[in-house]
């Protein structure tokens, strides 16, 4: 109450911000006549003038009024569109690194040009981020003439683009692309072995279109670059036969083998279920008699079993995925679009493939990953636009430090939002939906029907076909026609069934989108110019009459077939109607069989229903029910926010490590001379090894000199008799031994460098270091994943899982760095070179150097080899056979995950075991 009183007296934070922005709008408007008086050449010259003023020390804020006035006038001349005052406010909000909430049809694409133009003047690049390739190409194509007129270049990043083209696109002043492409390019740039292969510049300023979709809806989905891992494909097929033999529990405490928790999207095996599963697996021969699924040796079986259960119980065809060209393609739960190239992790995708009987592809190993939260926080300045951000304003502020500013509409909204109608069953609900559509169609009112899944959209389509109503279906299966269908959804009597928010980003114009139709005529090569002009003229004459008919019929009518988990998605659907002051209406139809009501509002809602007890086919409209449903949505939003926040808290740990790794990697890539760094690494590696067997401040009796000598020989090819040093000099200590060993290694290394040439050795060192970092980082990511999956169990020991995760991750990262340094030092000091005359080596081009000892690899060949090959050759100079058969013959037992006996430091399965 006190808050409301304060708002009435002082105004809300949003009101105060708008008041400040309106003062700047007045300054921009005052410059309009001056800009209109300029010739095209003079207006274009303003860009060079602004750049010079910035170079002279002026700030972007200082030139904002003039820059916005120039952009507005250029837009009027080039595009025929003049920015409204509210659009100027939106541009300033974006420039200030905030989120502009603007209703559908208010011209967000045009708003972005103001902030993009101003920030592009700094010469550091601006990224405009959209949700798909079509919108990126479309928006860039529409706005490129404006930017070109103002002397700025535009690039577009789309999937399947070659690296050279990507470099050119990123080098442009303004770059359009999708969130996925920008994120993956960042990861790929941090995997290159040559700095000139990088495509991105610094991450300076980003304007994110549909910011809620990208920063909220996709925040739980990390970007992952992966490679194939060792995997048993047959096990997925075998496990796929197990779930049908297990009994699903009706309730959490009921009888059965497993409980499906739809809220948490998890499957939980009961005690009975474990026993039953063990019996089945024992009969199949996968589990030994009296063995347990919980034993360490059977972790893989448990992993595959749970993946199979989740695939059968939680993931459904045409809702969570579709089968396309013999492949499982994920459906985006928020937009209904197909996510080609995306795969579920942890064996789930393979389990779904086994369930559907399609080809099972190997599970992947993570090579690099980042969440959208952490990627977009890398930008110096971030801003965004959407029609619905206010419900998630707290999340934007707390996670991204982005304030949301609600921009007033240019014209008052005239859409009528009717109360929800609630039915007992889904059947009754869909009958009412068809009846409403039929009535709208009779009076010529266009209808957009929103569904939450492909399955429901096809159900509505079948009902409409049965009723004889012509319609278009827009779901993930119709992605190619998406924009065209949405553009014509405002025609007289049009009926469009859309999955979730598919088609978002394309305006629905009452009477139909004339531009799409005229573009289609102009592109028709079968028509002559005269025929094209005649058809376009006829089209333009007929459009106004159709537009007026739709206006009279009540504008676009929105029908929601169920409430979404988030109020924001509902608002997005409603927002498709009533653009720029047009009339429109919306209504949601619900049933007690809908997932939201069934899972989150069932008990109290059912009690209300029983009291009201309507007849079949009669809808309930009641404030109590509406509040109950909104309460359920808030619960789900809160739960989803907590999940995203938890993902971020855990990823923040990995993110700090990622920054260190990528920073070190970048330093190696860009440094001309890494000799000092290499010397430090060799010194540290030797010191650590000596400290292991001669601990500081320990007694001589505690030293293990024979093992130290063996390790030095194996790791660094140093044949030293340290025991004789100790006998010869009683005063010698660990530090003296370190200094002697380091001196020996440095002398030998200097001799090798002299033989092959400094540049060849530097290139070799750089390549070895990068590959060592990449391989060890990949192993570290896998270890972090395993740690993350099991860390929740620490809570049973009264420990905080997050604190435990941070502590263990820090220890693992220290081990990672030590491992990388030791690995590099060991490999580089083990390479031996033939004692050929230096002059002979120097006379030859680097690529032709063949002066390599017969037992050791050629450095130039090593530069092109994989890390496994590098290590294998360098650590096996005498050609010892480390195959499983040879080891067995020598009586050595080496398991796949044991260190390779060659001394490489890699696991056996990744070294000589892999080669075998």
From Swiss-Prot:
Keyword Zinc (UniProt): yes
A Pfam family this chain is assigned to: SecA_PP_bind
Membrane topology: Peripheral membrane protein
Subcellular localization, as worded in the UniProt entry: Cell inner membrane; Cytoplasm
Entry annotated with the keyword Manganese: no
GO molecular function: ATP binding; metal ion binding; protein-exporting ATPase activity
Entry keywords, A to Z: ATP-binding, Cell inner membrane, Cell membrane, Cytoplasm, Membrane, Metal-binding, Nucleotide-binding, Protein transport, Translocase, Translocation, Transport, Zinc
Gene3D superfamilies, per database record: Helical scaffold and wing domains of SecA, P-loop containing nucleotide triphosphate hydrolases, SecA, preprotein cross-linking domain
Catalysed reaction, written as an equation: ATP + H2O + cellular proteinSide 1 = ADP + phosphate + cellular proteinSide 2
Gene Ontology CC: cell envelope Sec protein transport complex; cytosol; plasma membrane
Entry binding sites for ATP: 87, 105-109, 507
Note on how the cofactor is bound: May bind 1 zinc ion per subunit.
Domain of life where this protein originates: Bacteria
Cofactor: Zn(2+)
HAMAP family: SecA
Stated role: Part of the Sec protein translocase complex. Interacts with the SecYEG preprotein conducting channel. Has a central role in coupling the hydrolysis of ATP to the transfer of proteins into and across the cell membrane, serving both as a receptor for the preprotein-SecB complex and as an ATP-driven molecular motor driving the stepwise translocation of polypeptide chains across the membrane.
Record note on quaternary structure: Monomer and homodimer. Part of the essential Sec protein translocation apparatus which comprises SecA, SecYEG and auxiliary proteins SecDF-YajC and YidC.
Listed name of the protein: Protein translocase subunit SecA
